[in-house]
Amino acid sequence: GDALAAALVEARGFTRGDFLRLHPSGQLGRKLSLRVHEVMHPANRVAVGQPETRVKEILLRMTERPLGAACVVREDGTLAGIFTDGDLRRGLEDNENLLSEPVGHVMTTEPVAAHPEMDLQTAADLMEQRRSQIAVLPVIEPATRQLLGLLRLHDIHQPALD
């Protein structure tokens, strides 16, 4: 239903606002009405480290806070990068001593990020409409790049929020 409606929205020149007003209860309506800050995991529940933190320590933090990624921040709290299982796999291909390396050597620098007022559909588009799809987005304050939290694709596609 929502996929067909989305195609009609595009074909007839409806804006996202028009669709939200006319179909607020569907999945797409939910994604257009909710903002990232309403469903993200706050920074205090995210695995976080600094560029010099060893990969082994980052992995332990990711085990304690299992969201699929760790955010890497500078001393001032600004986002330096993100470390995912993909970074781990690529790193292990090149370096069997990866666990003792600083995460800054293998993290993704300048990751795609969301801001707290972004609607969920825009965030989903950032993750899905790219050559290499991603499953998590750091959430940052746009003006300062301070880490605010983490958003997973899974969180966006949940049928309903409690």
What are these regions (language model features)?
Residues L4, V39, M62, G77, ...:
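Terminal peptide-recognition signature
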